[in-house]
Swiss-Prot record:
Name the record gives this protein: Apolipoprotein C-I
Location(s) in or outside the cell: Secreted
Signal sequence region: 1-26
Family as reported in the entry's similarity comment: Belongs to the apolipoprotein C1 family.
Role played: Inhibitor of lipoprotein binding to the low density lipoprotein (LDL) receptor, LDL receptor-related protein, and very low density lipoprotein (VLDL) receptor. Associates with high density lipoproteins (HDL) and the triacylglycerol-rich lipoproteins in the plasma and makes up about 10% of the protein of the VLDL and 2% of that of HDL. Appears to interfere directly with fatty acid uptake and is also the major plasma inhibitor of cholesteryl ester transfer protein (CETP).
Taxonomic lineage of the native organism: Eukaryota, Metazoa, Chordata, Craniata, Vertebrata
Keyword Cell inner membrane appears in the UniProt entry: no
UniProt keyword annotations, A-Z: Lipid transport, Secreted, Signal, Transport, VLDL
Record bears the keyword Protein transport: no
Length: 88
């Protein structure tokens, strides 16, 4: 039963693959590629800038979290030592 179902699907996929690219998928000519190049570079630059800014903000916030965590642990250790010396 599986063979009867898979053979027609295989034939259709093979026919689509051998057909080649559709006209809309054809490679663009060199002139249109160079015309779109500045727009593509601006888009790439903007995306890179946004990602870089987001990464820097993440690092800054992560640094703040690390500093806060160390401050709390140091303060807790100091309080713990005071309790030990006071009540010992």
């Amino acid at each position: 039963m599986r063979l009867f179902i898979s053979l027609p699907i295989l034939i259709v996929v093979l026919a689509m693959a051998l057909e080649g690219p559709a006209p809309a998928q054809a490679t663009p000519d060199l002139a249109s590629t160079f015309e779109n190049l500045p727009d593509k570079l601006k888009e790439f630059g903007s995306a890179l800038e946004d990602k870089t800014r987001a990464a820097i903000e993440h690092i800054k916030q992560k640094g703040i979290l690390t500093k806060t965590r160390t401050w709390f642990s140091e303060t807790f250790d100091k309080v713990k030592e005071k309790f030990k010396t006071t009540f010992a």
